[in-house]
Amino acid sequence: MRLLSDEERAVLVPAEFDRFDSPIPTRIVASEEFFPLAQTPAQREVEARLSRLADTLAPRQGVSRRRFLRSAAGMAAAFLAMNEVYGPLFGVSRAEAADPGLADERARTLADQFIFDGHTHFLREDTRIETFVRMREAVGKAGWNPALIDKPQTLEDLKFENYVKEVFLDSDTKVALISSAPSEVPQDWFLTNPMTVAARARINEQAGGRRMFAHAIFTPGQPGWLDEIDRAIEQDQPDSFKGYTIGDNTHKDLSRHPWRIDDEKRVYPAYEKFAAAGLKNVCIHKGLFPPSVERQFPHLRPYVDVSDVARAAKDWPQLNFIIYHSGYRFPGGGTPEEALAAFEATGRVEWVTDLAEIPQKHGVTNVYGDLGQVFALTAVSQPRLAAVIVGQLVAGLGHEHVVWGSDAVWTGAPQWQIEGLRRLEIPDDLQASFGFKPLGPADGPVKNAIFGENSARLYGFEITRFAQRPDRLSALKADYLAAGGERSNLRYGYVNPG
């Protein structure tokens, strides 16, 4: 997979090189989907403030700096540092960072919150993405991570076993949906459709209950794609289908089959098959296509925004169109500050606002916005923008049409993102100027809906029944935590050292 050029990759370093073991990223971490921005002055200030807090509070709590930063109190300290830099966006107090008992009690209170992560990934066993192996070898040689020194490295951190640890043991996630991505090169699919449903079966069997859902990927225009839908429906029995209108997001230079959601001749036959099979949820990758990428691949630009969503939603009211990344355009090649400034001047966030306006403009109720990657990117780089994006989606789509996704494991264990949304509130000045309503408490109706109730409804999952029947995975997590299990605070990808 070669999404970044050799020249771009040469100036980046592995995210695991980051010496600062922060509970939340203090710089943007990118997969090869986009070129990450350099650490901003504000992010450097957050890092410095958190470092000082750790140096002060860890000795008082009788723990190492590393242990502190992996604790609930350390997580609170990270959001405290962010508030000091960006303003009061996150609900946290210095007392929570200073008192591990208080922090742990809050964590226990929220631990049973139902969280359905509708946007997760891991890589197949025979993946060719060797860049991540080289990254981990370099980490070991540099001595940054003692666990990697003098040990041959593999991609296990991006594969099944570590996925289970980071998603189900190191976070409050209760249910997840495993996704994939297609390619013109068959071996460069993240997971094939049979691999994806095999992972679902493996986790559910180990758990003794329903913990995992699975996509099947559909690829309009590729040879045999309709036959593959038929095969997947009959043999794999996926919970939903996912498509990439960009065609091949992995090898954009090879993408020969981009498509539009509202293409009657090419794509509507797939919707007919989905509807006939009772598969109502159509997940679509949109956005993450900044101007820098557009300059490289201008021919793909007509396929990556959300201009094709409304017509398809209107033509297919029996289906739900879940737009991944909520169409957010600027993951790199345009700064979050620029996006925030544009919003403050125009009231718009490119492509997110377009998505949020679809229900009012077109009278549809079957369009959903997914927070995967978009929340992670903006929360760590410009949390006011994260608040704006969530606020716009809630205002336009309705809080019952916004769904949680983390894009783990690329972003590491998703607990920092979960805590970010739990604590996030839209600042008073944005509420007054733009009419946003408060998001409310961590376990209030808006956030409970986003975190899990909406996806549970979409996928027919009974939350009450789940809560009443602890399974083997619940017991495994309890044993893991009792034995002192902790988050790694690792992320997998590239950072810009500038």
Spans of features found by a protein language model:
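Acidic (Asp/Glu)-rich catalytic clusters
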Residues: 164-172, 193-210, 229-238, 272-277, ...
